[in-house]
Amino acid sequence: MVIMIKHLASFALCAAALFPTFSQAKYQPVTIDNCGVTTTWQTPPQRVVTIGQHETELLLALGLEKNIVGTAVWFGALPPSLQSAGKGLTRLAENAPGFEAVVAQRPDLVAAQYTYHVGEQGEVATRQQFAGLGINTWIAPADCVGKSLTAGSNGDGGRDKPFTLDLIYQEIDALGKIFGVTDRARALAATLRNRVAQAQHTARDALKHNAQGNVVFWFSSTRLNGDPWVAGSAGAPGWIARTLGLTNIIHTAEEWPAVSWETIARRDPDYIVVASMARRLYPADDVEQKLAFLRSDPVTREMTAVKRNRIIVVPAMSLNPSLRNVDAVEAISQRIAAFHTGS
């Protein structure tokens, strides 16, 4: 069951009423280094194309929906509390947009969730290509700080330093300064911190009399009966596990390594967190097919988590570095509490 969390965007719905916009307050120029590119902002961006759902949701949560002129790279629907603010957004593409489609929106800023799309080998374009047209770029710090591709990593890369939500808080702070909405940014970060603290309390209460605390996070697979992409210990799911007092059974710095079901079964997780998404690039993108596989495959159906039906479904967005990591912390803590109270 997907647990929908309401808090995040309810903040955004009233943000404009609570705080003055940058047009109403004196803008303070700011210089910020972002993933190796230093930019001085003399005025806030007016026309933004977001490439990556996290960037879209972050701007919506800051009450900046009127600044978004195009979006791309969607994993699923917006959370209910952001849907009203985001209902008029233009989708240039569900996945990566073309360079021309982005430029046609006449953006003064392109904000990307992944260096894969806007980086040295950018699938959409490089930062230099955009700069040549006078377009500034922004890449989510969580996709470049402490992260790298190695000879042994897949396209998702690995982490030199474990992810924490501090990277998201840093991005909120930086974008608050860039757009001149620092009050909104501070309030959003405070709301997220309070929600994390409450989720930790819920998980501690549920686990204090129970030894079971091993977890695996399954994102997708190219084939249902092939090796699944599961979360390593240094990415966002690793932070989620540590925050809730759980132990990720996959001990690698790679973000989403492919690991055999036989290996996972030997480690026998107490909980399996499964990603739900609208994307359909691979058979295992479909959460219903994932669940059916877990309950029917001769190897997976013998795992403790499957036998006890301790499977937790969360939106895929909440397992990648984003605001929605807080949604995942809440959803997982609530389900664990329900498992151990029988509710």
Residue ranges and their predicted role:
Residues 47-120, 246:
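A short, structured surface patch at a secondary-structure boundary
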Residues 2-3, 9, 18-57, 160-161, ...:
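Bacterial Sec-exported substrate-binding components of ABC uptake systems
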Residues 162-171, 274-343:
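Structured C-terminal subdomain patch of bacterial secreted/periplasmic proteins
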Residues 99-106, 124, 259-268:
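Short helices/loops that flank or line small-molecule/ion binding pockets
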Residues 117-125, 138-176, 207-236:
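Extracytoplasmic ligand-binding site segments that recognize negatively charged/polar headgroups
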Residues 32-36, 90-100, 253-260:
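Short helix-initiation/N-cap motifs at beta->coil->alpha
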Residues 54-58, 74-77, 109-110, 115-120, ...:
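Solvent-exposed loop/turn segments at secondary-structure junctions
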Residues 76-78, 227-256:
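Alpha-helical, coiled-coil/dimerization segments enriched in small aliphatic residues
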